């Protein structure tokens, strides 16, 4: 592509990071930031150790445990660590705690106030920046695209490669624009927007593409809302998702620990401003969504694409034209224990999870607390937990009194971590029970063997807690 041809945001970031272009169409890409956690890094560090290699840029690498950490008390009264029950989880956590300092990498551990979910910590610390290439051995790394970064998940062998070389060999993706225009109505949040997008595109709609989310709705969202949008880019098949950086982005980042300062800040902002997609630039595919079509949303099946407005009815498998979709719908209905024509608002839930890298930031806490204030969870809700995305989110929420709102409503107020987003730690949903969850995946067994997951926004999760069933949050709004 000519340097004078109009380019998209993604193309500009890509071009700025090409170290070498190869004849087969692949490019050696420089990686600006590398986030590591305890699950996908042990083998990578062991391979470095065996080869006698060092981490090339430890200053551009940040290690944060999150997947396996229990969200209940982690230290005894005298400061000793509470033992991790699962041996594999304990080994992974111990390995990261040992590997990070050995290789000169900053480690934000469970004793640090800044510890949390890696995709919350990165933006919060200013480690994630617009225009940067960011990788992590985790599916939801696209989250950082809410700041205008090109961020994507990688496998363990690639984790090793980035640690050793600070580069990756990649093929450039196609470009896709998802434009959301209009104005969101009360009760409709960023989570509802991205669930709706996933329903429109389908689980594979963005395959092979990097999506740029544009339009008035995206511009009007807060940075935390944009992080929620980009977080779920992988759920509609995209390699990454981007929101163009703007004045909101700069205000969010300024003064954060890893953000540039002084003259470096001014230079950075000048470059970030240049990243906007040029007038006349074209995308390989464009999808336009009208905000008036987006309602508080909920999933009914076992894929994030199985989305309905809360007022909707469970679909019949025969309503899908594609035979494979019909078969998938039958399997989903059997697993989820639902029947065609059932009202989503009639579905009872026994568990509530507010947390995950999608929805565990301070705005998410506030949105849920606003619905719960002065109310109690329903008697049929056995288990309701709120898991802040980081120690700093937890501290701020406590300063605002939000923890008291949750506790008085019958919720447990937990320590930061991935928690019940995935069945990899003690926070699991019992088999056959339902959970209204603010996480990003509703796959079979995602929250524990036999667990039935309904993805919703924090406000919708709070509403479900109060009524004991999936509920239109607008009915509870003052």
From Swiss-Prot:
UniProt KW Amino-acid biosynthesis keyword: yes
Keywords, in A-Z order: 4Fe-4S, Amino-acid biosynthesis, Branched-chain amino acid biosynthesis, Iron, Iron-sulfur, Leucine biosynthesis, Lyase, Metal-binding
Top EC class, one word: lyase
Pathway it works in: Amino-acid biosynthesis; L-leucine biosynthesis; L-leucine from 3-methyl-2-oxobutanoate: step 2/4
Catalysed reaction equations from the record: (2R,3S)-3-isopropylmalate = (2S)-2-isopropylmalate
Cofactor(s) needed for function: [4Fe-4S] cluster
Cofactor note: Binds 1 [4Fe-4S] cluster per subunit.
Gene Ontology molecular function, alphabetical: 3-isopropylmalate dehydratase activity; 4 iron, 4 sulfur cluster binding; metal ion binding
InterPro entries from the UniProt entry: 3-IsopropMal_deHydase_lsu, Acnase/IPM_dHydase_lsu_aba_1/3, Acoase/IPM_deHydtase_lsu_aba, Aconitase_4Fe-4S_BS, Aconitase_4Fe-4S_dom, IPM_dehydratase_rel_enz, IPMI_cat
GO annotation, biological process: L-leucine biosynthetic process
TM spans (from-to): none
EC number: 4.2.1.33
List of residues binding [4Fe-4S] cluster: 357, 418, 421
Pfam families found in the cross-reference section: Aconitase (PF00330)
UniProt subunit comment: Heterodimer of LeuC and LeuD.
Family to which the UniProt record says this protein belongs: Belongs to the aconitase/IPM isomerase family. LeuC type 1 subfamily.
Its biological purpose: Catalyzes the isomerization between 2-isopropylmalate and 3-isopropylmalate, via the formation of 2-isopropylmaleate.
Name under which the protein is recorded: 3-isopropylmalate dehydratase large subunit
Organism for this UniProt entry: Novosphingobium aromaticivorans (strain ATCC 700278 / DSM 12444 / CCUG 56034 / CIP 105152 / NBRC 16084 / F199)
Gene: leuC
């Amino acid at each position: 592509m000519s340097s004078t041809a109009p380019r998209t945001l993604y193309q500009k970031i890509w071009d700025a990071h090409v170290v070498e272009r190869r004849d087969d169409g692949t490019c050696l890409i420089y990686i600006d930031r590398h986030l590591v956690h305890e699950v996908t890094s042990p083998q990578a560090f062991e391979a470095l150790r065996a080869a006698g290699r060092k981490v090339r840029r430890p200053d551009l690498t940040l290690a944060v445990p999150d997947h396996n950490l229990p969200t209940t008390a982690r230290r005894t009264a005298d400061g000793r660590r509470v033992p991790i029950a699962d041996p594999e989880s304990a080994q992974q956590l111990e390995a990261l705690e040992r590997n990070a300092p050995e290789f000169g990498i900053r480690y934000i551990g469970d004793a640090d106030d800044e510890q949390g979910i890696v995709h919350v910590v990165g933006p919060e610390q200013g480690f994630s920046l617009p225009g940067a290439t960011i990788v992590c051995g985790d599916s939801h790394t696209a989250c950082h695209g809410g700041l205008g970064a090109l961020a994507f998940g990688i496998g363990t062998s690639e984790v090793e490669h980035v640690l050793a070389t600070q580069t990756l060999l990649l093929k450039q993706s196609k470009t896709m624009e998802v434009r959301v225009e209009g104005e969101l109505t009360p009760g409709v949040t960023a989570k509802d927007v991205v669930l709706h997008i996933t329903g429109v595109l389908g689980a594979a709609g963005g395959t092979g593409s990097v999506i740029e989310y544009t339009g008035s709705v995206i511009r009007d969202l807060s940075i935390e809302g944009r992080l929620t949008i980009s977080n779920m880019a992988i759920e509609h098949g995209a390699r990454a998702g981007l929101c163009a950086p703007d004045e909101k982005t700069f205000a969010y980042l300024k003064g954060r620990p890893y953000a540039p300062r002084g003259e470096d800040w001014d230079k950075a902002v000048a470059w970030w401003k240049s990243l906007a997609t040029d007038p006349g630039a074209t995308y390989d595919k464009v999808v336009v969504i009208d905000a008036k079509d987006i309602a508080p949303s909920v999933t009914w099946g076992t894929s994030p694409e199985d989305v309905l407005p809360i007022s909707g009815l469970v679909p019949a498998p025969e309503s899908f034209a594609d035979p494979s979709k019909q078969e998938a719908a039958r399997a989903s209905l059997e697993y989820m224990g639902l029947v065609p024509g059932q009202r989503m608002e009639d579905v009872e839930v026994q568990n509530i999870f507010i947390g995950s890298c999608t929805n565990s930031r301070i705005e998410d806490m506030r949105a849920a607390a606003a619905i719960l204030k002065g109310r109690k969870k329903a008697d049929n809700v056995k288990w309701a937990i709120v898991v802040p995305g980081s120690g700093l989110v937890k501290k701020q929420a406590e300063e605002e009194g939000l923890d008291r709102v949750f506790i008085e409503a019958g919720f447990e107020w937990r320590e930061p971590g991935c928690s019940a987003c995935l069945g990899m730690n003690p926070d699991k949903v019992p088999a056959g029970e339902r959970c209204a969850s603010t996480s990003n995946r509703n796959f079979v067994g995602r929250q524990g063997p036999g667990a039935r997951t309904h993805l919703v926004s924090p406000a919708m999760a709070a509403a479900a807690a109060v009524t004991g069933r999936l509920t239109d949050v607008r009915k509870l709004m003052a």
